[in-house]
Amino acid sequence: GLFKVLGSVAKHLLPHVAPIIAEKL
């Protein structure tokens, strides 16, 4: 249900968010 949707959304966002986090570290 909801957790499955959140999981798929997180998988789509992770590739975009990871480089931003990497730049800040």
UniProtKB/Swiss-Prot annotation:
Belongs to the frog skin active peptide (FSAP) family. Caerin subfamily. Expressed by the skin dorsal glands. One of its GO terms (cellular component) is extracellular region. The modification Leucine amide is found at residue 25. InterPro entries: Caerin_1 (IPR010000). Pfam families: Caerin_1. Keywords: Amidation, Amphibian defense peptide, Antibiotic, Antimicrobial, Secreted. It is found in: Secreted. One of its GO terms (biological process) is defense response to bacterium. It comes from the Eukaryota. Its main location: secreted. Caerin-1.19 shows significant activity against Gram-positive organisms, but is less effective against Gram-negative organisms. The keyword Secreted applies. This is Caerin-1.19. It comes from Ranoidea gracilenta (Dainty green tree frog).
